Amino acid sequence: MNKDFIELDGAIGGGQILRSALSLSMLTGKPFRIHNIRAKRSRPGLLRQHLTAVTAAAQISSADAEGTQIGSQSLSFAPGAIRGGDYEFAIGTAGSCSLVVQTLLPALLHADQPSRVRISGGTHNPLAPPFEFLERAWLPLLKRMGAQVEIELLRHGFAPAGGGALVMQVTPSALRPLHLETPGPIHSQQATALVADVPGHVAERELARVGKRLKWPEQALKGIWLDKQIGPGNVLLLEIACGEVTELFSSIGQSGVRAERVADQAVDQARQWLHSGAAVDEHLADQLLLPLAMAGGGSFSTTHMSEHLSSNIQVIRQFLNVEIVCTQANERILRVELRQG
């Protein structure tokens, strides 16, 4: 194993730099040190979901890791061989299960055998992709690239209680390049409001706002009332399926935030993407970058250069010999192309 540590600054990009570095380190066998982890955040250092990602990555790659404590702002990680198998990881709070999935999946596609991974914690969190984003937007594109992976939601988990769980099954498989230039024509759209131990009028008001602002018909507006025991919780999901891509925009209901404001947050994201003409929005762009780098090539158009996309590009360049070219096609579209270096 290469013992020359890659040095990373975690002050920019938040936990995204750490997650990408863990994935890339396991894939390449290159160890890294990261300092100033989440230094600009209100709660700097490792939170429980970041620590779970680190300990999970260390377990599946037999890694030596130092700095693995809540609040730690420095970490070193030196991986061994990636080993498939049956794993179970508990975040212990409502920390995001989805972010742990996105850390582990790239490595498990290169494991020595199939894997089954159960993760418990939060499945619908502020500032993290909900389960449905993985299931309907991200993973279908990875499957088109050749990934053999299935994911199942076992139980919803809302902040702050958590208590959710998902299971992922991965068969080792190689990824092929993917090119996404335009989204294609829209062939379906669906707004879903999930509520648990929250007044029913919250879902009704969210959906009414979506229908009014996006001019979606009533049959495209759906409320789902979950078991009160897993609440309180509320999430609004806007799913837009096009020829090439399914996008999913979400907003998490929180105490003191009006239902109409929750709806507006998701609608604003959707409208920005719809009006841009780009193939993918900023979140899907950021999360496609590493799989395309693994595949050795590909391209997509997106709405703009986000902080996460920029920091992810920097991290990938430090681990892989890949050329990433970003071109401003017009004021609404950024084109990103990856090629073997």
From Swiss-Prot:
One Pfam family recorded for the sequence: RTC_insert
Major localisation: cytoplasm
Binding-site positions, ATP: Q102, H283, L284, A285, D286, Q287
Main EC class the enzyme belongs to: ligase
Active-site residues, Swiss-Prot/TrEMBL: H308 (tele-amp-histidine intermediate)
Gene3D superfamilies for the chain: RNA 3'-terminal phosphate cyclase domain, RNA 3'-terminal phosphate cyclase, insert domain
GO biological process, one term: RNA processing
Reaction catalysed by this enzyme: a 3'-end 3'-phospho-ribonucleotide-RNA + ATP = a 3'-end 2',3'-cyclophospho-ribonucleotide-RNA + AMP + diphosphate
Single GO molecular function: RNA-3'-phosphate cyclase activity
GO cellular component terms given for this protein: cytoplasm
E.C. number: 6.5.1.4
Keywords: ATP-binding, Cytoplasm, Ligase, Nucleotide-binding
Family: Belongs to the RNA 3'-terminal cyclase family. Type 1 subfamily.
Official protein name in the record: RNA 3'-terminal phosphate cyclase
Origin species: Ectopseudomonas mendocina (strain ymp)
Lineage: Bacteria, Pseudomonadati, Pseudomonadota, Gammaproteobacteria, Pseudomonadales
Gene name linked to the record: rtcA
